[in-house]
Swiss-Prot record:
Gene3D superfamilies: 3.40.50.12280. SUPFAM superfamilies: HydA/Nqo6-like. Its EC number is 7.1.1.-. NDH-1 shuttles electrons from NADH, via FMN and iron-sulfur (Fe-S) centers, to quinones in the respiratory chain. The immediate electron acceptor for the enzyme in this species is believed to be a menaquinone. Couples the redox reaction to proton translocation (for every two electrons transferred, four hydrogen ions are translocated across the cytoplasmic membrane), and thus conserves the redox energy in a proton gradient. NDH-1 is composed of 14 different subunits. Subunits NuoB, C, D, E, F, and G constitute the peripheral sector of the complex. Its cofactor is [4Fe-4S] cluster. It is a peripheral membrane protein. Belongs to the complex I 20 kDa subunit family. This is NADH-quinone oxidoreductase subunit B.
Length: 196
């Protein structure tokens, strides 16, 4: 008992404010703090899916499918020290679709490359997400009228986030990842293209 009293005596107001802030964050995620004496400050009870989504959103493993200049100018620049995509936990680019959570389609998708895009998407484990990066991946870009260009990767696979630009700036790429993170944490707020 003496230790608890000394602990509260040290700074009771700060501890209660911290507790209230923790409860507020947990309620925002849909969880409720467990009311079991002092354990309530460290344990939360809530939907398992919410906690899994929170973990997924903070440890995405992207797989780049660079088809044109967007892969070099936007994606690689976002991985450089100036923008540092690593600070968000997305720096480890995967070469295998079986190890990836996010497929980044960067550049023009031709009809010849389309089966490979679909095959890589199908090889990814669930849950899987797709980011279309650049005008060409989103809508075909300046090559949309060509006989050999697919007018947007969303004609082949469902896309979760669109990052416009030719090529998108690295900060736009980071913003796209943040939007995907928000979508994963709150799936009931934002629906996928195939769920509308």
């Amino acid at each position: 008992m003496e230790i608890k009293d000394q602990d509260k005596a040290a700074n009771p107001v700060a501890k209660d404010e911290m507790y209230e802030e923790t409860v507020k964050r947990l309620k925002k995620l849909g969880a409720e703090p467990a009311v079991i004496g002092e354990v309530a400050r460290t344990v939360s009870v809530g939907p398992l899916e919410k906690l899994l989504n929170l973990a997924r959103a903070n440890s995405l493993w992207p797989m780049g499918f660079g088809l044109a200049c967007c892969a070099i100018e936007g994606l690689m620049a976002a991985n450089m020290a100036r923008f540092d995509l690593a600070r968000f936990g997305y720096e480890v680019m995967r070469a295998s679709p079986r190890q990836a959570d996010v497929m980044l389609v960067c550049g023009t998708v031709t009809k010849k490359a389309a089966p490979f895009v679909v095959r890589l998407y199908e090889q990814m484990a669930e849950p899987k997400y797709v980011i279309a990066m650049g005008s060409c991946a989103i809508s075909g870009g300046p090559f949309v009228d060509s006989y050999s260009v697919v007018p947007g990767v969303d004609k082949l696979i469902p896309v979760d986030v669109y990052i416009p630009g030719c090529a998108p700036r690295p900060d736009a790429v980071i913003h796209g990842f943040m939007k995907l993170k928000e979508k994963i944490i709150n799936p009931e707020v934002v629906k996928r293209g195939d769920e509308r």
